[in-house]
Amino acid sequence: IFSGGSYGASAQTATAVVNMQNTDITVDRNGSLALGLWALSGGRITGDSLAITGAAGARGIYAMTNSQIDLTSDLVIDMSTPDQMAIATQHDDGYAASRINASGRMLINGSVLSKGGLINLDMHPGSVWTGSSLSDNVNGGKLDVTMNNSVWNVTSNSNLDTLALSHSTVDFASHT
């Protein structure tokens, strides 16, 4: 899927469900906001073996207004730089926290931001994340990361709620 702006795939209502498997998504802003996967208004996206490539200023995976995104197997998110938004939730008054769950081998170049949402990353062996993290704990939101035989190259100041490591490395030297 190639998106020259807006989004690659989106679930925009409470009855909307998008199921994807073995899919590559490339997002180019063309001057406006662009998102690889976008769930909102109670929409739900499930994905298995996805690759998302985002141009500068794009967002990889984004959930808002009580929506949910569940991803399994291999997940590649390659933003233009590690400070770009790879995975994020957004708080909106009057809505329950949105949820993003990912479990599998992950290659992430970009940051993970839990802003009023719940993000759970279960990184299987061979996973590499280069970027930063933020959890603002608004609306009951949190960011939990489990890493097994994986590497996180921390590129800037970061915080999260839970970090469980098994034979994994958190490389603070990547922060410049």
Language-model regions, residue ranges each:
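Long, low-complexity, polar and repeat-rich extracellular regions
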Residues: I1-T176
